[in-house]
Amino acid sequence: MGADERSLEEIVISVPYGTRKKASFTGSAGIVGGEKISSSQVSSVSKALQGTVAGLQSFSTSGQPGEDANVYIRGVGSVNASTTPLYVVDGIPYDGKLANINSQDIASVTVLKDAAAASLYGSRAANGVIMITTKQGQAGAAPSIELTAKYGFSSRAVADYDQLSTDDYFKLQWEGMRNRYINNGKTEAEAATLASANTVKALGINPYGTAYPQPIDQNGNLVAGAHTLWDDSWEDAMTQNAHYTDLSARVSGGSKTSKYYISLGYLDDQGAYICSGFKRYNVRTNLTSDLKSWLQVGMNLSASHSIQSYPKQNDTRTDNVVLFARQLPSFYPVYERDPETGAYLYDNNGNKIYDYGNYRSGSYAGMNLAQSMLYDKHDRKRDAVTAQGFVLVKPMEGLTYKMTMNLDYNSLFTHDYTNPTYGKRPIGSSAKGNTRTTGFTINNVVNYQHTFAEKHDITLMAGQEYYEYNTSNFSGERSNVIADGYYEPDVASTLVDFGGNADQYKLLSFFGNAEYSYMKKYYASVSLRSDGSSRFHPDHRWGTFWSFGGSWRIINEKFMEPATKWLNNLTLRASYGAQGNDNVGYYAYQALYSIGKFDGEATLHASRLATPNLTWETNLNTNIGVDFSMFGDRLTGTVEYFERASKDLLFSRSLVPSSGFSSIDDNIGKLKNYGWEFTLSGTPIHTKDWMWKLSVNATTYKNEIVQLPTEVMWSGSKKWVKGGSLYDYYLYEWAGVNPDNGNPQWYYYDNGEKKVTEDYSSLTSDDKVKSGSSLPDVTGGFSTDISWKGLTLSALFSYAIGGKLYNNDYTDLMGVGGLNGSSKSVELINRWTPENRNTNVPKIVDQQTSYFTSSSTRWLVDRSYLRLKTVTLNYSLPHSLLQPLTLKDVNVFIQAENLLTFSHQQGLDPEQPLNGTVSYRYPAMKTISFGINVKL
């Protein structure tokens, strides 16, 4: 956003197999400067992109350090194939994780959004392209040494949901039990007496001490004098004082014929939860040398080693660290307590004894992750190497030939160990696995550029590329660990599983591009690429994709001369093209077989039919845009309309039962995304001492289903129909609480008439109604940079307006069908009672009433939010102080990541997947750090 204030003639952007001046570019692209990336305190570059470019959505669905974000460019163009954009590093498609890349090494990020911009990458660019350019040295420059150090602290960006206090919990537990006894035929007095007598028994513990064996009286109140002897926070026990350390050193420079850039980096990004974090070590060397006036060679070499501590998360397992920290209420102690005094109990060594709560009700009996996780291991170790070399030959003026070879090597080593001593029914296990991938690319590109009669400019390009990807993996697990503290599988006695496989993918491509401009007013471009993919049958292996684009620099027309006093640029652009998508699996067209076992003998049976006619998914992309700038480029902007029509989408087509198979894959789907993008940047203040720059972008688009294999398809809470959207919720409609009895109600339809029922089981799919979309109406970001002399304040905000989330997290916290010894929301205080009939929270009844939290519109939440993604306060020391120290520049700064978040529901992190499903995910991190940057 606003990465560069230079004129269009000066701005150079990265494009497939080269660079172009922004003024002559007919496609759609957004640029993010390296300073924006380096100011972000995240371990993956993908998480730094949210809010920076119109049309790009980056969803940090896990705050686990070292995890990449889910990135989408102009929506989703497929249902069952990949929706991930192509990442290109220094001109070559990149196969590794973005978390492997040191953000301090990045010079710029260019986002290619339409066919004219990205079609030269062919089938791999169906979902857009994100081009990362790393820093280079400068020819003829003296050696420059730059050191950067950051140190800070991290915590949850959004505090967890507010939960019931112990006193309120016991009161509501009593109330639920009393209501159950009444429902079972007891009188109110009998029910109250029984509830008082059994509340402690139901929860398994008495935090009020033995002096108050029945802490809740027959009126549902605390007995006089009763108070809690402990109030433990499991959230505190499961989280840590996370530290953030980022160190890097960079050396760059060059001679008249060469340039170099060398860097070292170290990152230690500890997670908010115990036993989670990410460490990374980086090295990079970029070298370029002119051996002759007509011959240039270069090499880019990078390597990283990372260790990611990755506890269980993002699911409903009881050992999910996020879920465990939330689900245990404060009256269950972290450490064992004296039931009479509440004092800690100690072992023979004087250490506190962790409480495993075998007395607890519910599924967490016998568990204490606060201790057992300390003896477990869940590590992901990754080694990544990228080696790239090129030769550039200039045989004549305007003609170049470049050959580039690139190797991406990635090795992921996983180790999961559970100890045999601590935990729920511990027996111990050790599992190890390794996944190794190599991606090899070689391309040959010829470029020719010439100007005729000082008016006509042509650029021609032709190339060939070969890509080969190999992956292999194996994993094994053994259980019944016999010696704690030794983590290797051979310490376990029982083989649980062992397996492995290998896959290969090849792509051969031929491509070309032609560009023409006349008098720097009229520009045209055409691209063509043919890909041959090993994923399809030989008869359908080749796909040809194309694009054409044009632009008109209206500002250079003679009739615009009167306006040039205040208008600096006015350009109209348009493009149209087709891009393929072959990311449908390694063996998409082949019949598959499964190996099994029966009666002690090996078996082989068909698991999938061959699909020789399966072919490419295709995106047809339309883009129309207007670029403008005025007032000496103090105000610049872009407005674009786009349409992304996807056809031949991969779906399962039903087969007759006699075939022996339920379905077969086929190209039978169509989708369409269409919308608008807006970008506006300005410099309201520009004086000798003051500079203020502002930038804002916004994207709004719709998703439409054009064709499906059947009239109706269900995907969880989404109903897919022609003319609808992939993101449309269809749910039972919540009708609130019956004020007469406190029971939950839902709407249903009887011969078209809308009625109310308390019987959830009587509802049918015909009663589900369209309930909004998980797709936000508008997404984007805005930034501000204010400078005064040596002081600069920079901030980047991201936002979303509209759309809905389905909050699965909250259904557990709002369960009123028995509290079951798991934490509950403070909102239950507002439950229905005879004295509080006007409420949206049903009455509490301690019996099986799962329908109270069953799927309905009750759990939809507005996903609108505003987040202060990054903010930096930087001070550049005066040069007069640095000269005696022979220093070029010294900057000290304070940075914050995810400092502030404003959303519609307390406790909910609003950055959730595009499908809107919230499910016990590791929350985003807030990081505040102090740093210094020194240039020698």
Regions found by a protein language model. Name each.
Residues M1-E10, N102, L112, A116, ...:
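Periplasmic N-terminal soluble interaction domains immediately after the signal peptide in Gram-negative
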Residues K22, S28-I31, E35-V42, T52-G55, ...:
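Residues embedded in well-ordered regular secondary structure
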Residues S28-G51, F59-G63, V71-S78, I92-K97, ...:
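Short, polar/charged loop or turn motifs at beta-strand boundaries
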Residues I37-S39, T83-T84, R280, N286-L295, ...:
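Extracellular/periplasmic, surface-exposed regions of secreted and cell-surface proteins
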Residues K47, D90-S119:
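Short acidic/polar hinge/loop motifs at secondary-structure boundaries
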Residues L49, L56, G91, V109-T110, ...:
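Non-catalytic regulatory/gating segments with a bias toward low-complexity or hydrophobic composition
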Residues E146-G225, S475, D666, T683-S774, ...:
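Conserved small-residue
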Residues G220-V223, T494, S533, A800-N891, ...:
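Extracytoplasmic gating/loop element in the C-terminal half of outer-membrane beta-barrel translocons
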